[in-house]
Swiss-Prot record:
Lineage: Bacteria, Bacillati, Bacillota, Bacilli, Lactobacillales
Family annotation (PANTHER family): ENERGY-COUPLING FACTOR TRANSPORTER ATP-BINDING PROTEIN ECFA1 (PTHR43553:SF24), HEAVY METAL TRANSPORTER (PTHR43553)
GO terms under cellular component: ATP-binding cassette (ABC) transporter complex
Covalent S-S links between cysteines: none
Job description of the protein: ATP-binding (A) component of a common energy-coupling factor (ECF) ABC-transporter complex. Unlike classic ABC transporters this ECF transporter provides the energy necessary to transport a number of different substrates.
Superkingdom in the source lineage: Bacteria
Species name: Oenococcus oeni (strain ATCC BAA-331 / PSU-1)
GO molecular function, one term: ATP binding
Encoding gene per record: ecfA1
Name by which UniProt lists this protein: Energy-coupling factor transporter ATP-binding protein EcfA1
Ranges for domain ABC transporter: 4-238
Leader sequence residues: none
Keyword hit for Transmembrane helix: no
Residues reported in the UniProt entry to bind ATP: G38, K39, N40, G41, S42, G43, K44, S45
Family statement drawn from the similarity comment of this UniProt entry: Belongs to the ABC transporter superfamily. Energy-coupling factor EcfA family.
InterPro entries: AAA+_ATPase, ABC_transporter-like_ATP-bd, ABC_transporter-like_CS, ABC_transpr_CbiO/EcfA_su, ECF_ABC_transporter_ATP-bd, EcfA_1, P-loop_NTPase
Length: 277
């Protein structure tokens, strides 16, 4: 079942004759994980802001969980979508972690007692309940993003959108965030849309949408994207380390029966090849 669908979507920023989003058509299935990639200025962040109604399309249609986005349905649709942005510090407004998670529910007229229960449950879900009374400023980057994710989960959305949510973190922090999202998707059957410029972080995605100058240049599986060197080059994208390594090994004479998207799988394959087992 489609939970998101766009039809002939167009958008231009005020006083600009150039369309930031042009004739965009795509759909997302319930429970699917889609990653939107593209170089800077390709329209990635503009597109997700259109999906949530933060920006109003010039023309076209957006359908979220059976509702066509309009002024009348805007708040109902926003209840279905949670967005985590790039910089978690910009999302904190309270003195303690649990107050901050509860704050986001005030706009939804949720009773005070229920807000506290939801906030505690969301913090447990992301593994941050032990930090409930701490100040957000004392947390690491990865911990801050987990709290930001908890704030979104407390609203109980069906769709989770991550706008470069791990790009400012160190490798450990990024892994912390992606593993949290993976667990949540599996437990709650969330639909996930992540915006990313780093192809190294696509392995959890079911599908990839590549934007170029506001248009969809490709809507494909990960391995199909990685195998199209011309498409990657045109869009200033580089193969992730793991895929580049496999490409180099093929050229050196090692035959692969499949493409490996995880380091451990590749290491196991190479070990068996070398040992002859």
């Amino acid at each position: 079942m489609k939970i998101i669908e766009t039809k002939n979507l167009n958008y231009s920023y005020t006083q600009s004759s150039i369309r930031s989003i042009e004739n965009v058509n795509f759909s997302v299935l319930d429970g699917e994980w889609i990653t939107i990639v593209g170089k800077n200025g390709s329209g990635k962040s503009t597109l997700i802001r259109l999906l949530d109604g933060l920006l109003k399309a010039d023309s076209g249609k957006i359908i979220i969980d059976g509702l066509t986005l309009s002024e009348k349905t805007l708040w109902e649709i926003r209840k279905k979508i949670g967005i985590v942005f790039q910089n978690p510090d910009n999302q904190f407004v309270s003195g303690s972690v649990i107050e901050d998670v509860a704050f986001g529910m005030e706009n939804y007229q949720i009773p005070q007692e229920e807000m506290l229960v939801r906030a505690q449950q969301a913090l447990k879900t992301v593994g941050m309940i032990d930090f409930a009374e701490k100040s957000p400023v004392r947390l690491s980057g990865g911990q801050k993003q987990r709290v930001a994710i908890a704030g979104v989960l407390a609203i109980q959305p069906k769709i989770l959108i991550l706008d470069e949510a791990a790009s400012m973190l160190d490798p450990d922090g990024r892994d912390e965030v992606w593993q949290t999202i993976k667990k949540l998707k599996e437990q709650q059957n969330l639909t996930v849309i992540s915006v990313n410029h780093d192809l190294n972080e696509l392995n959890l995605s079911d599908r990839v949408i590549l934007l170029n100058d506001g248009k969809i240049a490709a809507d494909t599986k990960i391995n199909q994207l990685f195998s199209d060197s011309e498409l990657l080059s045109k869009n200033d994208l580089k193969l992730p380390f793991l895929q580049q390594l496999q490409k180099d090994l093929r050229e050196s004479g090692i035959n692969f029966t499949q493409e490996y998207n995880h380091q451990r799988e590749l290491v196991n394959f190479l070990w068996k090849s070398i040992s002859g087992t």
